[in-house]
Regions:
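Conserved catalytic cores of phosphodiester-cleaving nucleases, focusing on short active-site segments
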Residues: 69, 174-221, 237-238
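Short, solvent-exposed loop/turn segments at secondary-structure junctions
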Residues: 160-162, 203-205, 253-257
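Metal-dependent nuclease catalytic regions and adjoining charged, substrate-binding loops involved
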Residues: 227, 241-337
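Metal-dependent nuclease catalytic cores in nucleic-acid-processing enzymes
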Residues: 181-186, 221-253
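Metal-dependent nuclease catalytic cores that hydrolyze phosphodiester bonds in DNA/RNA
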Residues: 1-174, 178-182
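Glycine- and charge-rich intrinsically disordered segments
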Residues: 1-19, 146, 186-188, 299, ...
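Short, mixed charged/polar active-site loops
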Residues: 169-171, 190-195, 257-263
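A structural signal for short, well-ordered beta-strand segments and their strand-loop junctions
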Residues: 154, 178, 196-200, 246-251
Length: 337
């Protein structure tokens, strides 16, 4: 197993009291995005692998493009952006002056250009996405304009919730929060509440087959007809933290976008979001109970050996082990695969 001692704790999300066995693994909070991973993969990522090593996991061009597009809309619209303060090692809001469209695109294109593809297929996607990122940003801007995202826009706000059924807090970060001063385009049905929260999801074309000229064709990404369960779990947490906010979920591709809210999607109605939040808590309670089985153990390596016997790593999962062969092989050694 790949380990590296951490002498200085620079994670800003570590200020709550945690059980001793959780502290052994530097596990101090739950995150809605972590619920997407099966328990075995989650354990390898967040229990067995230290944060500084986890940051070495391979990414992919899809993720890098998604970050670029999200950053662009923040640069375009946000008046405050939450970032890590290098002095205090804590997340803090920074004032931000919105940028013009072309300036924002140029800035994120420069950031995306620094991404290093991890294999030949990733090179294909990287080169293609350099061309499609601007049009995807334009689609997202249209969606934000329709939603009225322009007043008091805050990006990457830190949301924290302590559920009495859990030992650890749930912590997440919202994409955009904003004041709904001019929302007549959405109709009278949202005369209240005056604040909105927007979760952004991007999808990207994927390479298909090689053409006669040696280049590759790409399959166009499409917006979904319904939101995914994982994304509903995320926005359910945001709704729990911000019950008075009008929640929207937007899917964006290079030539289209689709906005879901409680008026066109039953899953986003308040009572159904409450049900999804309960599903999220169930996942987190299960993981806490699993870890607390070893509350009296003092040997971390022994705990890990016991945990892997209780968890299915699901190495055939379609995305969660896309972390690089070095780390996949390390995990397979743990599970004796």
């Amino acid at each position: 197993m790949i380990l590296k001692d951490k002498k200085v704790n620079s994670d800003p999300l570590t200020e709550t009291g945690t059980p001793d066995v959780c502290q052994k693994f530097n596990w101090n909070h739950h995150s809605p995005s972590q619920a997407a991973y099966p328990d075995g993969n989650f354990a390898y990522r967040y229990w067995f692998t230290p944060q500084d090593v986890r940051r070495q996991f391979e990414g992919n061009a899809n993720m890098a493009a998604g970050v670029a597009i999200n950053n662009a809309i923040q640069f375009r619209l946000a008046e405050k952006i939450w970032k890590l303060n290098p002095s205090t090692k804590k997340l803090s809001p920074y004032d931000h002056t919105p940028l013009e469209h072309d300036v924002a695109i140029q800035k994120v294109q420069e950031e995306f250009a620094r991404y290093k593809p991890v294999n030949e297929k990733d090179v294909l996607k990287f080169n293609w996405y350099r061309e499609t990122i601007p049009s995807t940003i334009s689609q997202l801007e249209k969606a934000c304009e329709l939603l009225g995202v322009k007043n008091q826009v805050i990006a990457e706000n830190v949301l924290s919730l302590s559920d009495p059924r859990l030992l650890l807090p749930i912590i997440g970060r919202s994409d955009l929060e904003y004041q709904l001063k001019d929302f007549s385009s959405l109709g009278s049905h949202i005369a209240k509440p005056p604040f909105g929260l927007l979760e952004i999801k991007t999808s990207h074309d994927r390479p298909s087959r090689m053409k006669k000229d040696g280049t590759y064709s790409f399959v166009n990404a499409k917006v979904p007809t319904t939101p995914s369960r994982q994304h509903l779990l995320q926005v359910a947490f945001y709704k729990k933290c911000k019950p008075d906010h009008f929640i929207s979920l937007v899917y964006v591709v290079k030539d289209d976008f689709k906005i879901f809210d409680k008026n066109n999607c039953g899953d986003l109605q308040d009572e159904n979001l409450e049900n999804y939040y309960e599903q999220l808590v169930t996942i987190f309670r299960r993981r806490e109970r699993l870890m607390l089985r070893y509350a009296e153990q003092t040997d971390k390596d022994k705990i890990i050996k016991e945990l892997v016997q209780d968890l299915d790593p699901q190495f055939d999962h379609n995305f969660c082990w896309s972390i690089g062969s070095l780390f996949v092989n390390d995990a397979k050694k743990l599970w004796n695969c």
